[in-house]
């Protein structure tokens, strides 16, 4: 997933790496937060778009593989990350054009947590549906 975003939105990837380095001494402090990054118009992922994309980095686990957080913790961190994202989108919508349908903010995302974190998609999906955003889920 990260490789795809790095290729499509290299400007955001650089900022994401810097953000993670700033928090390297306490990566757990990022859990339940979302880092929303505005991409640059020159990023390949913005080709043909009317407005530049924003990339939301949701911190739901601070490790993967055997060291990953429990599924319950990841789902809870997803819920908290979504609350954080919603508040950022509400502020952003006051000054920037963002994708909306019938006045509801739209978020496009892959099936998060289902890959390296091995959380059943249905558990993540149930949390996402609680939030006041329209989510378009795609499979890569």
Annotate each PLM feature.
Residues 1-140:
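Macrodomain-like recognition of ADP-ribose-binding/processing modules
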């Amino acid at each position: 997933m990260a490789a795809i975003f790095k290729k499509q939105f290299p400007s955001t990837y650089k900022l994401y790496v810097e953000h993670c380095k700033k928090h390297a001494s306490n990566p757990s402090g990022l859990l339940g937060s979302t880092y929303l990054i505005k991409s640059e118009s020159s990023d390949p992922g913005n080709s043909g778009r009317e407005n530049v994309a924003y990339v939301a980095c949701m911190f739901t686990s601070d490790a993967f593989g055997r060291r990953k957080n429990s599924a319950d913790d990841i789902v809870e961190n997803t819920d908290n990350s979504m609350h954080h994202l919603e508040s950022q989108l509400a502020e952003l919508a006051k000054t920037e054009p963002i994708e909306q349908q019938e006045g509801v903010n739209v978020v496009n995302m892959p099936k998060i947590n289902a890959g390296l974190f091995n959380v059943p998609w249905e558990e993540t999906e149930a949390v996402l549906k609680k939030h006041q955003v329209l989510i378009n889920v795609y499979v890569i």
